[in-house]
UniProtKB/Swiss-Prot annotation:
It is found in: Cytoplasm. Pathway: Cell wall biogenesis; peptidoglycan biosynthesis. Its main location: cytoplasm. GO terms for biological process: cell division; cell wall organization; peptidoglycan biosynthetic process; regulation of cell shape. This is UDP-N-acetylmuramoylalanine--D-glutamate ligase. SUPFAM superfamilies: MurCD N-terminal domain (SSF51984), MurD-like peptide ligases, catalytic domain (SSF53623), MurD-like peptide ligases, peptide-binding domain (SSF53244).
Amino acid sequence: MKTITTFENKKVLVLGLARSGEAAARLLAKLGAIVTVNDGKPFDENPTAQSLLEEGIKVVCGSHPLELLDEDFCYMIKNPGIPYNNPMVKKALEKQIPVLTEVELAYLVSESQLIGITGSNGKTTTTTMIAEVLNAGGQRGLLAGNIGFPASEVVQAANDKDTLVMELSSFQLMGVKEFRPHIAVITNLMPTHLDYHGSFEDYVAAKWNIQNQMSSSDFLVLNFNQGISKELAKTTKATIVPFSTTEKVDGAYVQDKQLFYKGENIMSVDDIGVPGSHNVENALATIAVAKLAGISNQVIRETLSNFGGVKHRLQSLGKVHGISFYNDSKSTNILATQKALSGFDNTKVILIAGGLDRGNEFDELIPDITGLKHMVVLGESASRVKRAAQKAGVTYSDALDVRDAVHKAYEVAQQGDVILLSPANASWDMYKNFEVRGDEFIDTFESLRGE
């Protein structure tokens, strides 16, 4: 970590705690700042705030009082989940207080090379793939950012020989100014988080901030399956490295079920350790980054062949009596489930689907579920999912929860079949989040394996 004096003896307000806010507050204190933390959660229910107070950091909890900004703050560090139309943020900007993101703070003190990964889908898997390939190739890739390791925490233990492999959300990229990765990846761009950004155009603009400070000596890896990426490529100073599953490009591409990089045959599609067309795209993006980082083809091939996936993202759990189990609880929308199903022979798949009812029908899913061996349906949206199953001519059964669904799927499964949890729905009707839902699937699998 670099020693900088930017924040020394400067009053800094950290707005919003969670893990990134806590990490930012501790880093700022280490840099000599006079830190105040403001979090909406009441102090007596806020162990993080209590811990920071014990360390001498001022905390204001339970509300976001605008008068707090009457103090002469030199900077605000904003939690990424807090929108820019938040009254505290608006007042800070009106007072011309610079509003920084936590990843920008980390960047300012980093002496490590930075690889930044963003996009609508596939960020976590691609970030993990890249880190694993770098580490297998003898480099030290440190996971950071939206993947669960706050950048401002990771950066404190990193040095100039390390590479930060940073997953970045659109929330984190909004408002970055100096942030400059040496290699950036945009996996894909889909209409999402529009409630936060207001429009698809504003969402794309936030993602595109990743390349604002890049030059021709930096590399931007883009998905040329998408026309929008091809158009955006014309507007950056960075050197473009495209990847595509549909055409031969001057980067990473698929030809005759083989993955190539600029004419070099790297590996077979069938050897990628995780199934699904989306994971072919993730592997291509990883190959592009790995080649730019000087990793050998053998290391790339071995790492991607042995890659077991990321928890809750088409995660291969193993087999019970020849029946394979895949946990794709992160599939909270139709598109994600479509991509998951693309990696399997439908005639051998028992799909567990359903969850929070957002009022949408599932007709888009009909071509993808046609031919499934069976479906097990659960949650608020069960009636809508069942209508799609009926139209697709797929048999189905009802389940009370994920545990019940696994047992019902197991009853109809035979050796060689696949039990796939890919709900196409959010989890909040029955579970706190998709992780809890996925953990119940894993626990039930472990119980079956132990019988």
